[in-house]
């Protein structure tokens, strides 16, 4: 009787460490701790109303957004799991105004962890897929982190990933050597490699955008979406479908698996605040993953990974996904400026 050998996340990381020689042991251990925290978050999400974790917490985060109970719980799970391991100098989160230095009573490491503990949390109460997004940077100041230590462009990321808590719980990871997907086997509690070297098709007929904001869009985005909506009779000569989950991890995961373009552009409502998504813990890690899978990511005017951050909670426009479509939108932005 043959036994199918399965590759767990731990085995995969150890093999990468041996084969590529560019995955330090501390980084491998850090990724495993983050993945373990995501398992705990998945467990709490799956309990739903049975865990008394639905609804709002009666507080707001630094962006002025109402915090859900699971937002706060997920943030605490990630902090508690990572503060004592000796791999980190500091952490930063969507749910905290300032960064979190590793307490003096724990050993400190050379890495910085930035995360959105529960992306798409507006969907919690209606049981739509949500997730966790994270990014890992090296601390340029050794083990004494400051806020400035975090303000590195996305090209400096050494690892990035996300978990999706949906019909299956999956963990998607890149360390700069392609993108792989692991599925949580709840019977044994292990992450098992289920998709290797994911690639985003260069062309697509699907797009994701919140069309209710159409009246606020700037001309390049309006031009692009109008062309898609014109269908086979329009300038593109083919029909396109719109998909919008209002959960970035879910929308990006779909694009990673079957192609598409995701857009959360700047609009005219807030000209002084370019975009809604946060650069450090949403746009950068997702852009790293998308580029590693053969896609592209831009603000419309600049490659997202080249943006120099000015603050932990900086916002940027985000257009990412299938390469040819992203490049078309970028070209429309450039033409509008010329």
UniProtKB/Swiss-Prot annotation:
Organism per entry: Burkholderia thailandensis (strain ATCC 700388 / DSM 13276 / CCUG 48851 / CIP 106301 / E264)
This protein's name: Fructose-1,6-bisphosphatase class 1
Entry binding sites for substrate: 119-122, 210, 276
Localisation per UniProt entry: Cytoplasm
Enzyme class: hydrolase
Catalysis: reaction(s): beta-D-fructose 1,6-bisphosphate + H2O = beta-D-fructose 6-phosphate + phosphate
Keyword terms of this UniProt record: Carbohydrate metabolism, Cytoplasm, Hydrolase, Magnesium, Metal-binding
UniProt GO MF annotations: fructose 1,6-bisphosphate 1-phosphatase activity; magnesium ion binding
Entry-linked PANTHER family: FRUCTOSE-1,6-BISPHOSPHATASE-RELATED, SEDOHEPTULOSE-1,7-BISPHOSPHATASE, CHLOROPLASTIC
Biological process per Gene Ontology, one example term: fructose 1,6-bisphosphate metabolic process
Keyword DNA damage: no
Record lineage: Bacteria, Pseudomonadati, Pseudomonadota, Betaproteobacteria, Burkholderiales
Record-listed Mg(2+) 1 binding positions: 94, 116, 118
Quaternary organization: Homotetramer.
CDD domains documented for this protein: FBPase
UniProt EC number: 3.1.3.11
